[in-house]
Regions:
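C-terminal motif of bacterial Sec signal peptides marking the signal peptidase cleavage site
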Residues: 4-7
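Bacterial signal peptide processing site
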Residues: 9-11
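N-terminal carbohydrate-binding accessory modules
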Residues: 16-87
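An active-site-proximal structural segment forming one wall of the substrate-binding cleft
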Residues: 28, 68-88, 102-134, 138-172
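A cross-domain feature marking catalytic cores of carbohydrate-active enzymes
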Residues: 48-52, 90-94, 130-136
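A short acidic, helix-capping loop that chelates divalent metal ions and anchors anionic groups
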Residues: 57-58, 97-101, 138-139
Length: 172
């Protein structure tokens, strides 16, 4: 899974508490840090965009079927893999799924759905790329991630807190 930054974990539930887990973690971290952008790009291969689904919204409310597409299924992801794709980009809008300051907590049900879709992708041995998509469009109701608005300190705080939650959720 790729977010804004590349990361990987060994999947151990011991949180690195034993020597083997620490060795596994070091090996995985070493493998990722030794890859340059060209190598990563080659490894990820041809990608497919799962657009107009998790970034679809109406009146500032994200909903994967609001633009007329069906619910994302694992069968869809399997069909994508069968066509030879190795990577799936999953654009996601958060908009009103983000709570108020100071925590800006993302709605757990929405994050669970994003997780489910990411799990379809990763579970089929594909790379997943997720982003924040549409939250900065001037044409999208309730967009908040706009670089020319006067409240830049608030926007930066919200951006950092939202990405921290996404990164924490998908770190493994």
């Amino acid at each position: 899974l790729m977010l804004g930054l590349t990361g990987c974990a060994n999947g151990s539930d011991t949180n690195g508490s034993d020597a083997q887990s620490q060795a596994d973690t070091a090996e995985v971290q070493s493998a990722w840090t030794e890859l340059d952008q060209t190598t990563i790009t080659k490894e990820m291969g041809m990608g497919w965009n799962l657009g107009n689904q998790l970034e679809a919204s109406n009146a500032g409310i994200p909903s994967e079927t609001t633009w007329g597409n069906p619910i994302i299924s694992e069968d869809l992801i399997k069909a994508v893999k069968e066509q030879g794709f190795k990577t799936v980009r999953i654009p996601v809008s958060y908009l009103d799924k983000i709570g108020a300051a100071p925590d800006y907590t993302i709605d757990s049900a929405w994050l669970d759905r994003v997780q489910e879709v990411v799990d379809y992708v990763v579970g089929n041995d594909l790379y997943a790329i997720i982003n924040i998509h549409g939250d900065g469009y001037y044409t999208v109701d309730k967009s908040w991630l706009r670089c020319v608005d006067d409240n830049q300190d608030e926007i930066k705080d919200k951006y950092e807190k939202v990405w921290a939650q996404i990164a924490d959720r998908f770190k493994d």
